[in-house]
Amino acid sequence: MSYYVLSKIFLYSGYLVIGFLSFTIFNKNLRNKIRDKLKNLYFLYYLTFFTLFIISSNLSYYFTEKQLLEDFNIFEKEFFEIHKINEQFFQKYLLNFPVPIRMELMSKFDPLYTVFNASFEKYAKNIGKSSYEIQTNYKNYIRTTNSEIKEKLEQIKENITPIYNKYKLPILNGENTEISIDENGNIIPVIKNTNGQITELLFYDQNYNLIPFKKFESYKVRFDLIPENKNINFKELINVYYLDEKNIITPIEYYKNNIDMSPYYIDLQENKDDFLKAIKIKKEYGLYIEKKKQLQNLTENDKLDDFKEFLLKNNNIFSLNTIFSNGNPIFTYAINVKAKSIINYLITKEFNINLTNQNSQTALHSAIIQKYDLNFIKSLIEKGANPNIRDGDNKLPIDYSDKTSEIYKYLIGI
């Protein structure tokens, strides 16, 4: 008899116990007969059924897990096929987000628990099974408490980690850039020629665009290859620096300090065949996220003085282009929560007014959706807001305005 059959026998036995116990509870005559017969031991009747139910449930669960363990090789094949499909959907989903939000999402990411329904549906269609059946079986394995199964899951999880970890690396035009690293494991995006030589370093500007890193302040950015170290698995290390007025080498720590867009590092000492398995999160990143929440709260409550003081104290990690964890840039979020004082302050400052949120909407989209008046819309246009940017639904800002409104007439005339 299979473990599956045994688990079902004990499962339905438990149902029968509960059914009979419920019948007793709701049948007054039967309750009275049992009470008269058992007298002071009446409680044992219910205790016996409760005990039988617990035993049946535990045995059902035990044999279910035994069956899962026996079928693990079959599940393992399904697991890899599902995640091959899932990575395609994951890429499409993740690349819609600005870099800081993508990095933050990856910091919370666990591949075992992040499988799209569409992945189950596509896999089920490929093999001619029910999507519900595939999904239920997958969840049964993920939720198991069996230590042997959990150990096996961790082993196969390690094999799929690289296909997801690559999204922690810099991405340009939908593809990972080439990378090098410094002696501390900080990830440095680079461009290489056809001979595999580094020709250019890249960095994220304040608008979250990946661009050539040629100037640091007023100095020319330079780099040297660090001689090979047998104790380091990642072979290509570089030293990034500039020469000051006295021709003294000064290290550039952009890649170390830019926690917003570069929160990960490669563990150079960890003995891994594939460096993608050795990507880790910088310890400062958790504090950065907490501070970003503080800034968001100040914006939401329109506390301008505290807002300005906070940015002044943390200007090395935050700017007016910072994007909050909810996917909104500071200015867009201020518009959404109608933080009037902060809006009036920000509009006098220099920042990228066309940064998009998690829905690919700009501040202009949000202002029209939130029904701000014509004067405010005009001030955004004068500030440089682009009325021709489409959001995730392929809509222009004007598409959210009433066609009889002054705002519509103004935007249509631009």
Swiss-Prot record:
Coiled coil segments of this chain: none
PROSITE patterns: ANK_REP_REGION (PS50297), ANK_REPEAT (PS50088)
A Pfam family that the UniProt record links to this protein: Ank_2
Matching SMART domains: ANK
Keywords, sorted A to Z: ANK repeat, Plasmid, Repeat
Domain of life assignment: Bacteria
ANK repeats mapped onto the chain: 326-355, 359-389
Protein name: Putative ankyrin repeat protein BB_B28
